Amino acid sequence: GIGNADRNSSGKTVTRRNDEETDRINFTTAEQIHTGWDHAANAYYAGELGKWNIDFNADYLFKRSHSDQNAMNNDDATVQADSRMRSSLYAAKLVVSAPLWNGRFSFGTEETFTNRHDIFTQNGFSADADDHIKQSVYAAFADYSRSIRHWKLNMGIRYEHQQTDYYEKGIRIDAQSPTYNDIIPVLAASWSHNGKSFSLSYRLRKNNPDYSLLTNSIRYRSKYEYSQGNPLLKTQKTHRFSAGA
């Protein structure tokens, strides 16, 4: 999609010491957001080859935006900032499945490639930023599920290679460009009989920080308040055990 949006805010900040007012700031912020053309494309295939089911899906996304920010404190123009962002994503997933030993076996691959470039310039209240993040994820996985009388069993494993390349003003920053090689297991069992049931499961989850949290761009909120990402944030891994009845 394409379009523009305007955001305007105003307020005041009062500073007190020992119950006496020491500073008062009336502020007004105006922000114009310009979105360029967003592109999205999808391709998929679902079919059979003998006993094998084949499911393939691929996506492409492209987005860019541009915003101008102007802020005034006590009628003095103090902040001018310009932010530009371009991002793209390619993703593909292939899953092949078939009956096996009275259960179902599946395996496949998944690939994701992302590319985001943020450019931030300002009039002196902070530092300019030029951040470029590229990330590639390659994964292979297998899964098997089966029902045995009152039991339902599921087990799976996934190998994932994740490479991130972080650039500041065109220079790769090794300390902020991690590589992960992870084996991610999934185990689950449930039992049900005569209205009674219980379940057990274990899963390893990975959560990557959003790109907006990794940028060095500084967002002005008031004379005393700024917001900024942290490019040193790492992927979070959580071991999750659950039981229910």
Regions found by a protein language model. Name each.
Residues 64, 117, 161-168, 177, ...:
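Surface-exposed extracellular loop regions of Gram-negative outer-membrane beta-barrel proteins
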Residues 57, 87, 100-104, 181-184, ...:
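A general secondary-structure boundary signal
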